[in-house]
Amino acid sequence: MKVISNFQNKKILILGLAKSGEAAAKLLTKLGALVTVNDSKPFDQNPAAQALLEEGIKVICGSHPVELLDENFEYMVKNPGIPYDNPMVKRALAKEIPILTEVELAYFVSEAPIIGITGSNGKTTTTTMIADVLNAGGQSALLSGNIGYPASKVVQKAIAGDTLVMELSSFQLVGVNAFRPHIAVITNLMPTHLDYHGSFEDYVAAKWMIQAQMTESDYLILNANQEISATLAKTTKATVIPFSTQKVVDGAYLNDGILYFKEQAIIAATDLGVPGSHNIENALATIAVAKLSGIADDIIAQCLSHFGGVKHRLQRVGQIKDITFYNDSKSTNILATKKALSGFDNSRLILIAGGLDRGNEFDDLVPDLLGLKQMIILGESAERMKRAANKAEVSYLEARNVAEATELAFKLAQTGDTILLSPANASWDMYPNFEVRGDEFLATFDCLRGDA
């Protein structure tokens, strides 16, 4: 980590804790800043705030009092989940207080080069794939960012010989100014998080910030399956490397069932360790990064063939009586579930879906539901999901929660069938996050296996 003096004796407000806020507070304190943390969770229910107080960091909990900004802060570090129309943020902007993001703070002190991965779907899987391949090739890749390891924490142990492989959400990118990865990947762009950004155009603009400071010596890897990529590619200074499952491109591509990089065959699609057309896209993006990083073809192929997926992201959980279970709780929109379904035989598939609708067009899912053996539907979006099932002429049952849905699916399943949790909706109507939803699926699998 570079020791910089930019924040020495500067009064800085951390707005919102969670993992990233806690990490930013500790990093800034190490850099000599005068840190105040403000979090909406009450102090007696806030272990992170309690721990920071024990380290001598000022904490204010229970609300976000706007008058706190009268204390002449010189910077604000905003939690990514707090929108820019929050009264505290609006007041800070009105007072012309610079607002930093936690990932940009990490960038300022990083000795290690950064590979940044963003997109609507596939971020975590691609980030993990890239780190696995780089490490298998003898490099030192450190996972960081939106994948659960705050960048401002990981950067403190990173040295110049490491590489930070950083998953980045639109929330994290919307406020960056100086952030510059050496390699950036945009997996795809679909209308998600519109409740936060307001429009698809603003959402894309946030994602596009990943390349704002890149130059021709940097590499931007784009999904050539999407028309928007061609439009965006014209506006970047970075060297663009495309990937595609639909056509031969001057980068990574799928042709006759083989994944290539610039005419060099790397691996057969059937040899990939995870199913689904979306995972072919993830693997192509990974191949592009790996080749730019000097990893040998045989190592790339071996690593991708053994890659077993990421928890909650088309995760192969196991089998009970030759019935296979997959946990894809991370699929919180239609596109993610469409891509998950592409990897299975619908006639042997029982799909568990439903949750909180965040503006999905459920008719878009109908072609992918055709021929399904059964659906188990749950959540706030149940009526809309049922209409889609009816249009696809798929029979369905309703469940009160994921546990009940999994039990119902298992009762209906026969030898050789697959049970897939791929909700196509957010989790917040029933669960605090997709991880808790997926964990309930995993726990139910364990119970069913124990009873079998």
From Swiss-Prot:
One of its GO terms (biological process) is regulation of cell shape. It catalyses: UDP-N-acetyl-alpha-D-muramoyl-L-alanine + D-glutamate + ATP = UDP-N-acetyl-alpha-D-muramoyl-L-alanyl-D-glutamate + ADP + phosphate + H(+). Pathway: Cell wall biogenesis; peptidoglycan biosynthesis. InterPro entries: Mur-like_cat_sf (IPR036565), Mur_ligase_C (IPR004101), Mur_ligase_C_dom_sf (IPR036615), Mur_ligase_cen (IPR013221), MurD (IPR005762). Its EC number is 6.3.2.9. GO terms for cellular component: cytoplasm. Belongs to the MurCDEF family. This is UDP-N-acetylmuramoylalanine--D-glutamate ligase. It comes from Streptococcus pyogenes serotype M12 (strain MGAS2096).
